[in-house]
């Protein structure tokens, strides 16, 4: 049975659930019981997909792993969401039987779904509900259980493990070992926390290091027991038990690089039957590192300032500002699309800058007295002090400069990008997470210096800097989408790849009839992630942060 979510095919990647500077994150654990059996010769191979409602459309957020040949799966992959008390966050959990390796959901059999708000799950802590068909009628079989846990502890643990001389389980070959980690649940039963990858054809596996939130592994309690199970993978889902052991984070933390911790893997049945039994192999904990996974809010609370600069397009294609058809025409309500974009972004960002003094620059205009074209001028006509006091100051300087300049061209972005990048480069000399620069460019048309702009953006991607581009009017903004590296990483004309995606482009026309906060959410959606990504890459913790 094919499945297409309401509103069309899902969008890959995570959808930001509002602002990322919320108070807490919530982790959702999903399991299924008595699911429909869609396979003829074996049991279903279920996986769960989480959709989030965004502007009336269901958008794919994430997927669990596939539980092979299992009608009662407990998925080790968790869904981690930002929780906002003031918003109704609608969620849909859909279960599928994996038939092919395709990422397209209509290639898999639909097993059922359940929809509710995040608040419903959080207030109940754990809910169990019957699965429904797409028409909201009962699926006939199968229930879903969703448990919520607040991730208020931002510590994460990275474990690197290996095995030595594990029991051979395959008749004509060696074992295909993997590990499962469990913690005690509230109901007294062991709860699956993490499953490693399978290492094929070996009795001496080396697993990839993995990182999980400390609260997921042990509820933040370093002494809480952790059960580790070792299995030999079987493609039909009937994995062979190799052995087990119990440990704790406190014990595992004894392992350091160069000083591994070795733990015997015990099969209790073999131990009872054979007096000569020693173990079923050794699990080697090569390293255990606990560190903090800092959030955007951690950096803001740590004193990081968001340094905001506005760049405004004054090219002739905007039209004469005295003409009501001009994009720079200020209507009787005292606004236009340029001012709306400045207000939408600036009103939020100004709260994160203590002095609220923002440079406001223009490009593409001829300036008095000699009427030379400039692509990097202060709109208050004070090149030594281009700062405006708050968003109000930017709006006032913008309105005041319109009668005194001549709109011209071309539409060159690179001078303003390089202008802000120079200040961002100076900030890196401090080697602290105290400043992050945001450039808002508002423009009506096609970039003239695309080659130079690509190079400037690639260089800026190495700095504490993000670029927001708001396109006003009805021009073709295909080039802007190219700079916004959501689908593929931007490269300069020399072939150098951007260190990270720092450009967010939004066409204003999509928000003309929407609430003003809608534009702000869209424009600022990627910013918290970009801030964290930069400081994390540079190994810069928030100032005054506590050790893990």
Swiss-Prot record:
GO terms for biological process: cellular response to calcium ion. InterPro entries: C2_dom, C2_domain_sf, C2B_Copine, Copine, Copine_C, VWF_A, vWFA_dom_sf. It is found in: Cytoplasm; Nucleus; Cell membrane. One of its GO terms (molecular function) is metal ion binding. Ca(2+) 1 binds at residues 39, 45, 97, 99. Changing residue 234 to N: Leads to a reduction in the amount of calcium-dependent translocation to the cell membrane. Leads to the constitutive (calcium-independent) attachment to the cell membrane. Changing residue 97 to N: Does not inhibit calcium-dependent translocation to the cell membrane. Pfam families: C2, Copine. Belongs to the copine family. Calcium-dependent phospholipid-binding protein that plays a role in calcium-mediated intracellular processes. Exhibits calcium-dependent cell membrane binding properties. This is Copine-2. It comes from Mus musculus. The lineage of its organism: Eukaryota, Metazoa, Chordata, Craniata, Vertebrata.
């Amino acid at each position: 049975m094919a499945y297409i979510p309401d509103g069309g095919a899902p969008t890959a990647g995570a959808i930001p659930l509002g602002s990322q500077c919320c108070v807490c994150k919530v982790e959702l654990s999903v399991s299924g019981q008595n699911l429909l059996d869609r396979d003829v010769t074996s049991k279903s191979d279920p996986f769960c997909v989480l959709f989030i409602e965004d502007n009336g459309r269901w958008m794919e957020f994430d997927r669990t792993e596939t539980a092979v040949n299992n009608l009662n799966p407990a998925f080790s992959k968790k869904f981690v969401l930002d929780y906002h008390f003031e918003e109704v966050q609608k969620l849909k959990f859909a279960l599928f039987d994996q038939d092919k390796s395709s990422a397209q959901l209509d290639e898999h059999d639909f097993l059922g779904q359940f929809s509710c708000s995040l608040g419903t799950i959080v207030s109940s802590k754990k809910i169990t509900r019957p699965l429904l068909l797409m028409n909201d009628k009962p699926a006939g079989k199968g229930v879903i259980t969703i448990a919520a846990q607040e991730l208020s502890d931002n510590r994460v643990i990275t474990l690197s493990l290996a095995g030595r001389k594990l029991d051979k389980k395959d008749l004509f070959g060696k074992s295909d070992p993997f590990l499962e980690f469990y913690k005690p649940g509230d109901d007294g039963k062991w709860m699956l926390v993490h499953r490693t990858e399978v290492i094929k054809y070996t009795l001496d596996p080396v697993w990839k290091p993995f990182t999980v939130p400390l609260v997921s592994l042990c509820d933040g309690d370093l002494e809480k027991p952790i059960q580790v199970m070792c299995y030999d993978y079987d493609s039909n889902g009937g994995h062979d038990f190799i052995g087990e052991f119990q440990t704790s984070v406190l014990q595992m933390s004894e392992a350091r690089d160069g000083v591994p911790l070795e733990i015997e893997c015990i099969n209790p049945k073999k131990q009872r039957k054979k007096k000569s039994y020693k173990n079923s192999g050794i699990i080697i904990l090569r390293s255990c590192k606990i560190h903090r996974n800092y959030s955007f809010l951690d950096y803001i609370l740590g004193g990081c300032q968001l340094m905001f600069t506005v760049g405004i397009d004054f090219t002739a294609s905007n039209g004469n500002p005295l003409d009501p058809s001009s994009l720079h025409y200020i209507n009787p309500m005292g606004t236009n699309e340029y001012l709306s974009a400045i207000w939408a972004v600036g009103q939020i960002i100004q709260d994160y800058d203590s002095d609220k003094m923002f440079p406001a620059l223009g490009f593409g205009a001829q300036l008095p007295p000699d009427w030379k074209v400039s692509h990097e001028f202060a709109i208050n006509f004070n090149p030594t002090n281009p700062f405006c006091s708050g968003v109000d100051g930017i709006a006032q300087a913008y309105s005041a400069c319109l009668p005194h300049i001549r709109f011209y061209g071309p539409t060159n972005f690179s001078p303003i990008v390089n202008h802000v990048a120079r200040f961002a480069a100076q900030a890196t000399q401090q080697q602290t997470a105290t400043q992050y620069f945001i450039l808002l460019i508002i423009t009506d048309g096609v970039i003239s210096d695309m080659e130079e702009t690509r190079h400037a953006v690639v260089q800026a991607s190495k700095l504490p800097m993000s670029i927001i581009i708001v396109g006003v009017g009805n021009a073709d903004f295909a080039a802007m989408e190219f700079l916004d590296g959501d689908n593929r990483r931007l490269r300069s004309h020399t072939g150098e790849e951007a260190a990270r995606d720092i450009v967010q482009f939004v066409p204003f026309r999509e928000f003309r009839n929407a609430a003003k906060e809608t534009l702000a959410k869209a424009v600022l959606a990627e910013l918290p992630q970009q801030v964290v990504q930069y400081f994390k890459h540079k190994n810069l913790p928030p100032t005054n942060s506590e050790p893990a």
